Amino acid sequence: MKDRYILAFETSCDETSVAVLKNDDELLSNVIASQIESHKRFGGVVPEVASRHHVEVITACIEEALAEAGITEEDVTAVAVTYGPGLVGALLVGLSAAKAFAWAHGLPLIPVNHMAGHLMAAQSVEPLEFPLLALLVSGGHTELVYVSEAGDYKIVGETRDDAVGEAYDKVGRVMGLTYPAGREIDELAHQGQDIYDFPRAMIKEDNLEFSFSGLKSAFINLHHNAEQKGESLSTEDLCASFQAAVMDILMAKTKKALEKYPVKILVVAGGVAANKGLRERLAAEITDVKVIIPPLRLCGDNAGMIAYASVSEWNKENFAGWDLNAKPSLAFDTME
């Protein structure tokens, strides 16, 4: 049987990434050109800057991904691409490159939901058994997803306001930490104590919804009031207290979801899945099901995860036409 190679593109935000997946499970290359340094001084991602960077480097990323995989353009069997959710300008760069490559070589084009990519990155650890439950935590999303089979995703719970990664970056900015602040807050939290009483919104409510805006506001108010009074607060203790509140919320809702949807596997994915505190809480408290977390290199945005997610779409022959467009607000269906 002839080997099949998927060339995958990911440009939904501030990472330009191209990857090659061989025979559905062997990631041969996963090139990532990060723009973090360009966005740090703004304290967040500037969409126009992100789009321009994607244009500048995407051709080189394609060449590097193919070279690293040890294949040529003629060896590629299909092209996969993120078409949402994300920044519309950034998405369009990846879409344009993917469509051009697929059209020029007469290859099928596979559309992939960015969040499906995060979830299916777990496939790199071991073959997934369905049904399963997933906790997806990133800068733009916090949601619980029930997956009845590969490619069939249903949201069973999500945030009403801020995503957890967004809350991390906002409190990090208040403390003067470098963007993105998640890793630094995690490190500082492990050096401090949970001594500040921050709210755990909706933690006792009988639903699977999250809320982080109240926690974020309480943190900002405490920090602001201390500054006004000239009081000194421990950054380590602030981080420890904030992270403890976040983890309490995430764990409470995840446990409720596992009670409601009996599964054997819990996937935890997205950029925040790299958080050491979250991994420690999962290991200590989720013991009745197997917890699968993608390796750190596949937690952030990358094309490797898009390649893994494209396999089920390819098997279903879910191919896109040349009119495939960016869908910045693309979302999974909600469980009825």
Curated annotation (Swiss-Prot):
What are the annotated disulfide bridges? Answer: none
Reactions accelerated catalytically: L-threonylcarbamoyladenylate + adenosine(37) in tRNA = N(6)-L-threonylcarbamoyladenosine(37) in tRNA + AMP + H(+)
Cite the binding residues for Fe cation: H114, H118, D301
Residues holding substrate:
L136, V137, S138, G139, G140, D169, G182, D186, N275
Set out the biological process GO terms recorded for this chain's protein.
tRNA threonylcarbamoyladenosine modification
Its Gene Ontology cellular component terms are: cytoplasm
Localization in the cell: Cytoplasm
**Keywords assigned by UniProt?**
Acyltransferase, Cytoplasm, Iron, Metal-binding, Transferase, tRNA processing
Q: Which InterPro entries match?
A: ATPase_NBD (IPR043129), Gcp-like_dom (IPR000905), KAE1/TsaD (IPR017861), Peptidase_M22_CS (IPR017860), TsaD (IPR022450)
User: Which cofactor names does the annotation list?
Assistant: Fe(2+)
List, in alphabetical order, the Gene Ontology terms for molecular function in this entry: iron ion binding; N(6)-L-threonylcarbamoyladenine synthase activity
SUPFAM superfamilies (alphabetical): Actin-like ATPase domain
Give the UniProt family note.
Answer: Belongs to the KAE1 / TsaD family.
Explain the purpose of this protein: Required for the formation of a threonylcarbamoyl group on adenosine at position 37 (t(6)A37) in tRNAs that read codons beginning with adenine. Is involved in the transfer of the threonylcarbamoyl moiety of threonylcarbamoyl-AMP (TC-AMP) to the N6 group of A37, together with TsaE and TsaB. TsaD likely plays a direct catalytic role in this reaction.
Protein name as it appears in the record: tRNA N6-adenosine threonylcarbamoyltransferase
Q: Which source organism?
A: Streptococcus pneumoniae serotype 4 (strain ATCC BAA-334 / TIGR4)
